[in-house]
Amino acid sequence: MRPGNNDAGELVRTAALSATQFLRLKKVEGHKKVKAGDRVVDLTHLDKVYWPDQGYTKGDVIRYYIQVSRYILKYLKDRPAILVRYPNGISEEGFYQQNVKELPDFVTALKLKNQAGRTLNYVIYSDLASLLYVVNLGTIAQNPWHSRTKNLDEPDYVVIDLDPHGAPFSTVLKVALVVREVLRDMGMNGYPKTSGSSGIHVYIPISRGHDYAEAARFAEAVSNRVASLAPKLATVERKISERKKGQVYVDWQQNARGKSAASVYSVRARPLATVSAPVTWDEIAGGFDLRDFTIKTVPDRLKKKGDLFEGLLKESQRLPRLAREQ
């Protein structure tokens, strides 16, 4: 029998709650069993404080992921997970875990080679039960691969990561609009979201048949064009010491097999419990405050605006010829 996910001591012997019943709890504390589909997931130490300044707990994170599960699971399903665990909250340094050796029966794993050539046992996101399992391990942010298990060498999208590294957020928004302009000139659409930290991610959906090398060449071409159109605002220079003050780093190098980025609707291990939230291009143009997107505000935003990122799953775009050459 494979071990479960109780991480300390005996679980309190109580009947399993449905996800709806869990959300109705006025106070989430101790240990709980929650039914997720036909599975029962043990959730432990729910009153452990993860964000000391706000008093947000592990239970608050789990509550959030249950609230947004019907949305986030569309973007996680069938993707290998890179776990970044904060079992004691954000006040302590987290750690990466890709090789997971012991899993309950309801969590799928797949042995894959990482970029260094090592064979690792990756958790595969499949349903609410698997999501709750990894969150219970202290995995605050969800970092899936860009490809699914059926087509591991073919990413579903290209990612352009706008990293301010000290530049004003207003500059990040300006650079995002340049990214949109470059994509339009190429006949492509992109979907922006906050990184959940200090930047913006632009995701470009692509059709089947493109490998990671093609995705990377396309991302590099877009990034170089952005930097050439707005040299005072943007750069593709990796060395921080070589960048001009106030430039936003246009990072295209996350487009490789085994790389990941925080999923849309993912919580981040950052102050205020911010969330990587989809935004409209009109919001990019008008400006907004990153602090407005947290575990306390995003569920209501979803109810009002729906899933602003769903085009990523519906749209299929062939990469321009430049990405297929060489």
Language-model features, listed with the residues they occupy:
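Active-site palm subdomain of RNA-directed nucleic acid polymerases
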Residues: R180-T194
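C-terminal accessory nucleic-acid interaction domains of nucleic acid-metabolism proteins
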Residues: M1-G55, I62, L73, K77, ...
